[in-house]
A protein has these predicted regions:
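Short, well-ordered alpha-helical microsegments
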Residues: 56-60, 83
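Short Gly/aromatic-enriched secondary-structure transition segments
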Residues: 61-68
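Active-site neighborhood of phospho(di)ester-bond hydrolases with catalytic His/Asp-centered motifs
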Residues: 97-103
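Short, acidic Gly/Pro/Ser/Thr-rich loop/turn segments
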Residues: 54-57, 311-312
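Short glycine-enriched loops at secondary-structure junctions
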Residues: 50-55, 104
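Divalent-metal-activated hydrolytic enzyme cores
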Residues: 1-44, 68-70, 77-95, 106-379
Length: 379
């Protein structure tokens, strides 16, 4: 979706997390929006493309309660949309709704993203959330931390120097973090200005342009200083052989790899990764929906969101999940269609009532099935 030269800082900041609402408000508003678009009560087949994490269960319950049907499963681990399920989903209802969401945990005490407390464990321990996203980005974080701690800036006489570990200079590697050396090292006649080779590293002359981007106390330090946080996202790329099978095991990683420099250098890597995955999945899925013949001639609403999971407090069974809508695609049965950007879909949702007079009574519906006369199955 994003080119390697895209302004990722702008792209990520365009996804405003402050445009959030509780799921208990989001779902009835979404239902009422569908009804305002001509969707018929009792004939709407919702579908969700959520991660398989148990903390996504509460949103699913709310979808069932307000739409009157348990949502079809359109999702894979990590919030990836299984687009090969469009056809069966289209056969299950008159009007169609698809809700895609990546998710990330949030700790209100530390005001940080990426973790969730598991109440069903003996010690209520906290784990990375989304676990799939955490697993995917960890290798990239490790590579970044190695580079941060093995590139040194200093000064020898009047010469500003940069010392780089030999591993980072090995261009024959099949995978790893690769530096944009032309932005960091002084080049003369197309050659890197090498001062000396050490046992495990090399010392170069820093480019004047790069030096200008650094604080004076870093670039001019007489004692070598780790580059640390000054290794910005424009100074490196990642390479890694990944299976390109669409919607396969590595699909989430494929969504993120080009944006990894911005993810690992951000203050909240898990949040940024979840936002980017939501953005990529909306763009990708939208293009498959418009080509899916099963959806032609149907009312359809597809929305992509970021789910923020706040761990349940003592005495609570479910998380306080908040939804951050990103974008929506709306199609009418007459063939007309349009997309809504974040501010537009949020505005449309906020115009809807948070009360749904057509929601089902879950307890009554369950009791009805408990009380129903048994049916003998003949084999």
């Amino acid at each position: 979706m994003f080119s390697i030269n895209a302004n990722m800082k702008s792209i990520v900041s365009d996804f405003r997390v402050d445009q959030m609402m509780r799921y208990s408000l989001f779902v009835p508003r979404l239902y009422n929006l569908c009804r305002s678009l001509g969707f018929e009560s009792g004939n709407i087949m919702p579908s969700r493309a959520f991660c398989s994490d148990e903390n996504q269960g509460f949103p699913i319950i709310l979808i069932a309660k307000h739409f009157g049907a348990f949502p079809f499963n359109h999702g894979q681990v990590g919030g990836i949309v299984a687009t090969d399920r469009h056809a069966p989903h289209a056969q299950h209802g008159k009007d169609m709704v698809i809700i895609q969401a990546s998710h990330v945990g949030y700790n209100p005490e530390t005001e940080t993203f990426g973790h969730y407390t598991r109440r069903q464990t003996l010690d209520n321990h906290t784990t990375t959330t989304c676990g799939k996203i955490g697993d995917v980005i960890q290798w990239y974080l490790d590579e970044y931390h190695f580079a941060q701690n093995n590139i040194f800036l200093g000064q020898e006489g009047d010469i500003h120097t940069i010392t780089i570990d030999n591993q980072l200079m090995d261009g024959t590697r099949s995978e790893g973090l690769f530096l944009n050396l032309e932005k960091m090292i002084l080049m003369k006649n197309g050659q890197q200005s090498l001062l000396r080779s050490l046992s495990t590293s090399r010392v170069y002359v820093v480019s004047e342009e790069f030096c200008k981007t650094l604080p004076d106390d870093i670039c001019s330090a007489r004692q070598s200083t780790c580059i640390g946080k000054h290794l910005g996202p424009d100074l490196f790329v990642y390479q890694r052989p990944i299976s390109s099978h669409n919607e396969g095991y590595n699909h989430l990683e494929l969504n993120l790899i080009k944006q990894m420099p911005w993810i690992v250098t951000s203050h909240e890597p898990m949040l940024v990764a979840a936002k980017i995955n939501t953005q990529v999945e909306f763009d990708r899925t939208f293009r498959t929906i418009v080509k899916a013949q099963g959806y032609w001639g149907k009312n359809l609403l597809f929305i992509s969101c970021l789910n923020i999971d706040i761990s349940p407090q003592e005495g609570q069974l479910f998380p306080l999940t908040k939804c951050v809508p990103w974008a929506a695609y709306i199609q009418s049965s007459d063939g007309s269609s349009y997309t809504l950007e974040q501010s537009e879909i949020v505005e449309r949702l906020m115009q809807q009532s948070s009360e749904n007079t057509e929601q089902i009574d879950m307890e009554a519906a369950i009791q009805q099935m408990i009380d129903a006369q048994g049916i003998k199955i003949i084999v």
